[in-house]
Amino acid sequence: CGKSYEEEEEEEDDELEADVAQNLSSKRSARQLDADMENEVLNLARSVSPAAKRLALEHTAEPALAAQSAAAATPPVGLSLPPTAPLGFGPEDMQQALQLQLHSYIEMVRQLAPDAFPNPNLATQFLLQNSLQALAQFQALQQLKQQRDQQLPTASEQLPTRHYSTPLSKSPLRSPSLSPVARSMEPQQAQRTPPNSLAAAGLGLSSAVLTPNTPSMQQQQQQTMTSTTNASSTPKPLASGATVAAVMATKLEQSPEETTDLEELEQFAKTFKQRRIKLGFTQGDVGLAMGKLYGNDFSQTTISRFEALNLSFKNMCKLKPLLQKWLEDADSSVAKSAGGVFNINTMTTNLSSTPESILGRRRKKRTSIETTIRGALEQAFVLNCKPTSEEINQLSERLHMDKEVVRVWFCNRRQKEKRINPSLDLDSPTGTPLSSHAFGYPPQALNMSNGGHVLLEAGGSHCGSSISSGE
């Protein structure tokens, strides 16, 4: 207490200066320790431990040995394997990465827990060893993955060659679609040996069972191929296994005259059809006229097939001269008629004198009936669907029509009614009158006045289409 105020202040200043000096010295010593620790860590990073070196050498040696063994085991395919791609990790890059990791780890340890790790050198050494081991394992895994990727395409290239290792002689009854035959021979076999041609070529049952894989069938195919390729202008006898299709193909190749005959037949059939229609003859008339003229009766179906080119080549060749002669006779008869126009009367009056008149009869024209006459016929049909011969004569005289036309109209009308109403009995010999409602006429529409004449009132329905008179 005997000290003055100024002395107390001086003592406090001296104590503060002493504290500051101690703090500065402690900080300097701490900095020196930090620098020494960093140098030790860097030296550890540069000098790798022998255990880590041994592990890295083992991992690098194993992929090299595996690559050598794989190269020795796999045969050369013609394509050299690509070299191993570099991993992109040099020694300098590895050291820099490790140094950065160590610095960051040391700073993190000092900031978070300065008292937890009294000796940070051991922690940094442990971290360095772990990082080196992880890096070596990563490199080994990358090399193994690259080797597997390189071995996959080589294995896929070798797989297709295994399909052709089985011999063909062990399976004589194998179907052609399932047999592993070369693709280049398939179009030739498809052209020369169709499946249905074995029986047609005259082969037995034992040879018909054979497939293209058997030796005997292959010999027959070789014989057919050599015979077709060495064919000259004169046809040679083919082997027993030659098919009908191959024979026809060789004939068409050897005789170009047949192709011209086919073209001529096609053109003649077209011309014949046009001339026949222009002259007014039907296909049935042509067949009948040819029977009368030349003694060969032909049906309408035969003439139709000739015009449509649906007959065989031989039948077409046999039929062509007869039709050509008939066409010439028809043209000459047209030229002899008055004014050069076709006249059916000139061909029907002299049937016994001139051969041109026996060409056949012409089809009658379609008979057209007026609406009023058709209405009267419908009314008569309602009253009696099957009139007698006398009733037909009276009706034809009253309507000023031909008796044959009226008779044919009633026949056609009965057939039409059968199609419309199948339950009605129109074949009764008495010809009973039918109800007017069955034909769509009301009872008021029928008027039986005017001396027995059948008339149709204005309210009756009419059919405006023409009725064809049959023959």
UniProtKB/Swiss-Prot annotation:
Gene3D superfamilies (UniProt xref): Homeodomain-like, lambda repressor-like DNA-binding domains
Organism this protein belongs to: Drosophila virilis
Nucleus found in the keyword field: yes
GO MF annotation list: DNA-binding transcription factor activity, RNA polymerase II-specific; RNA polymerase II cis-regulatory region sequence-specific DNA binding
Polar residues: compositionally biased ranges: 186-196
Gene name in the database record: pdm2
Keywords, in A-Z order: Activator, Developmental protein, DNA-binding, Homeobox, Nucleus, Transcription, Transcription regulation
GO cellular component: nucleus
PROSITE patterns linked: HOMEOBOX_1, HOMEOBOX_2, POU_1, POU_2, POU_3
Major place of residence: nucleus
Disulfide bond entries: none
Low complexity composition-biased segments: 165-180, 197-230
Entry keyword Cell cycle: no
Bias-annotated ranges (Acidic residues): 1-18
PANTHER family (UniProt xref): POU DOMAIN, POU DOMAIN PROTEIN 2, ISOFORM B-RELATED
GO biological process, one term: cell development
InterPro entries, per database record: HD, Homeobox_CS, Homeodomain-like_sf, Lambda_DNA-bd_dom_sf, POU, POU_dom, POU_domain_TF
Domain POU-specific as annotated: residue spans: 257-331
DNA-binding region as annotated in the record: 362-421
Homology family: Belongs to the POU transcription factor family. Class-2 subfamily.
Protein name: POU domain protein 2
Top-rank lineage group of the source organism: Eukaryota
Annotated function: DNA-binding regulatory protein implicated in early development. Involved in neuronal cell fate decision. May act as an octamer-dependent activator of transcription.
Subcellular location: Nucleus
CDD domains: homeodomain
Chain spans, region Disordered: 1-32, 149-238
